[in-house]
Amino acid sequence: MARKRSIAKVIYEYSLHYFPVPGRAEASRVALALSKLPWEDVEVSSVGYEIMKNSGDLPWDMLPILKTPFGTIAESSAILRFAGREAGLIPENPYQAAKVDEFIEGMGPLARALDSTFGISDIKKRIQLRKELFEPQGAGTFNLKLLSRKIAQSETGWAAATDEMSIADLKLFTELFGLFSGNYDGIEASVLLDYPPLLEYHSKVSNEPRIHRYYQNFLKDEIRWTFHPDAFEQQKN
């Protein structure tokens, strides 16, 4: 199911609010699209974000948020778990569900890897610091090696070694490969060539029928090109 956007005279019960980039809301967008919830994707500008923050619309002064008939949910992982439950992407087996939570929590350092570079206005310095993240001793390299090892160890090929795709896969797939979309200057897609297990994982998830169908709605030359099945083939040549 394609994500729904608001149109005239249509009121959706659920609305996801985030900046107009994949980022930390993308996994929840996919989960909502795979659920049966009536929802809309609300893109927030930097000015809109300040207005929301100053008006008290953001429980923790951050985006994304999900507005529901019951109230507002903040924090990307909480939103993902809510949407993932509606989409049937949380295992019923308690152990597997716990391993999904474990994997999501374990991804924290990857999600925060670029945080220290966002406030740097000097583009040359920003690019230099981001490149250093993926040098041999960089934090980015450490995280890629760890994730590559975790994927290689999974007997099922899914992120948390679950029987089926879970919200851990949505988070890993969107946040990891979204880093290499070109949206973050200084981070080259060719970095991934050193991690064959991650490229194999990309192929597995991007070709999963529901994921493949979802991203068919997006052009390959826009910011979500890294989520298409053949995204990194050119890097191999």
Spans of model-derived segments:
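C-terminal helix/juxtamembrane-tail motif
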Residues: 2-5, 211-237
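GST-like fold's C-terminal all-alpha helical module
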Residues: 95, 99-210
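GST-like domain detector, emphasizing the conserved glutathione-binding G-site
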Residues: 3-132, 232
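Conserved hydrophobic "DFG−1" position in protein kinase catalytic cores
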Residues: 67-68, 172, 227
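Active-site-flanking alpha-helical
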Residues: 84, 175-176, 215
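Glycine-rich, flexible loop segments associated with nucleotide phosphate handling
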Residues: 12, 61-62, 164, 190-196, ...
